[in-house]
Design a protein with these regions (language model features):
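Extended beta-strand/beta-hairpin segments
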Residues: 1-53, 61-147
């Protein structure tokens, strides 16, 4: 564990928190009032599923303006994040993000241009993707709530 001086001070913009609601069950919060149930049971996301949804939606949020310009402001889309897991190391080895939308109105050249623009938008704006690509240091601090 790190020394207390290494603790990043939580703020509304750099942190989320979760409170324990039962055995292996937490309710996660952000400063904007959103909540998500985290656990292994019905109606709950596992931490791994949250990581997948974070990457998937980071991609689509980063590219939304490009997709809307090509497909129309009210376009319908779904995004899927599938993974391969290295069971021995208890980690995901590969992430595959699939954006699914009606692309039939685009000819092959338009589709190629849109694909490149979507990739560039994601490369510019997806913090979750950048973090997974480059890695990030993680630290654990066990803190006394009375101190």
């Amino acid at each position: 564990m790190s020394e207390p001086s290494d603790v990043i001070t939580p703020t509304e913009t750099n942190s989320v928190w979760a409170e324990r609601t039962g055995t292996r069950r937490y309710l996660a919060h952000n400063a904007r009032g959103a909540e998500v149930a985290v656990g292994m049971g019905p109606g709950e996301f596992t931490p791994g599923e949250l990581l997948k949804v974070a990457l998937a939606t980071c991609n689509t949020l980063s590219a939304d303006h490009r997709l809307a310009k090509a497909l129309g402001e009210d376009f319908d889309a779904n995004v899927i994040c599938a993974t391969l897991k290295n069971e021995e190391e208890e980690r995901y080895s590969d992430f595959d993000v699939q954006i699914v939308a009606d692309l039939t109105a685009l000819d092959p050249d338009q589709l190629a241009v849109l694909t490149e623009r979507v990739r560039r938008a994601i490369d510019r704006g997806c913090t979750v993707g950048h973090t997974l690509d480059k890695g990030a240091a993680t630290r654990l601090h066990l803190l006394d709530d009375e101190g």
